[in-house]
């Protein structure tokens, strides 16, 4: 029993930025092993875009892990709060979505998350179920439990207040409503990104304020770096891997990450144990394993998770064909730009380079091709047409210039 609990806690802590209330988590896991009684784990997602990428799955993978140790996952789609817009980390007021946009974006979430989570022990919730019913009286009671001074402890709010930038009252409501979700759902544990710590602590505080006889533990997970290894994975930055992408594109993108970033992806995305990952590192260190083969295993694992082993095998074969013969892949990702855009800006915006300075160095080093011709002029600008831009041997993208 003690050995099982020790292993469980080690895996739960894996990759986490911070855990608040570890003793309570241990108590919950122990009770599950003794009585088979499951505990409630909550994680919320605002459906501001229709598709999930690997950055989102860091939390979902941790939810799946917790299911192995007794969690009943409540996967919260914040259809109500998405209409406010999470201001976390923003230096200006964020434009909210309307309900039609939110519900449209949420349509594919269930199909996507069940590629990772055990459906039997997962409940998908929408926070409009209780927040719509809260009403004016309930909202005032909720606001009365928190002070403006406490709100201004949040770095992003404090910065905007100091710089005389606008902060709407509605934005103050976001962490309160997210915290109230924990009250309504009776969460034992809440997961969130490390930028969400303040909001998660509000939930813990409100559970006490509303008289619940528990105080949720908190697990914060890091934001996954995108393919560039610099900025967080984001569709808007072009450095993402979507979980609904074609297998070949998914495999090729994962193979494009640096060897150092590969270990970050292993820790946060792979189902391999920490011991197995250490064995892989040991193999590379002692030259019994090649980094490319280890990266191929990671790419194969991730493709198989969202498709199947056969698709993963075919994607690996396709990548080997492209890599060895320096051929263009059959499936290319696409980006649209306006006529006149410069090659330096394109390389940065599609996530091939973290900065225009790096893009300039890559061009000077002969590493950038357009339609398989080496780019020598860093001031090159695109005219209307279709192009394939390439960085190194493995990174390709189709450009549609309008």
UniProtKB/Swiss-Prot annotation:
Name of the protein described by the UniProt record: Tyrosine--tRNA ligase
Keywords attached to this entry: Aminoacyl-tRNA synthetase, ATP-binding, Cytoplasm, Ligase, Nucleotide-binding, Protein biosynthesis, RNA-binding
GO CC entries: cytosol
Sequence similarity: Belongs to the class-I aminoacyl-tRNA synthetase family. TyrS type 2 subfamily.
Binding site residues for ATP: 235
Motif annotated as 'KMSKS' region, chain positions: 232-236
Pfam family name, one: tRNA-synt_1b
Gene name tied to this protein: tyrS
Single GO term (MF): ATP binding
The organism's taxonomic lineage, starting at the top: Bacteria, Pseudomonadati, Campylobacterota, Epsilonproteobacteria, Campylobacterales
SMART domains associated with the record: S4
PROSITE patterns on file: AA_TRNA_LIGASE_I, S4
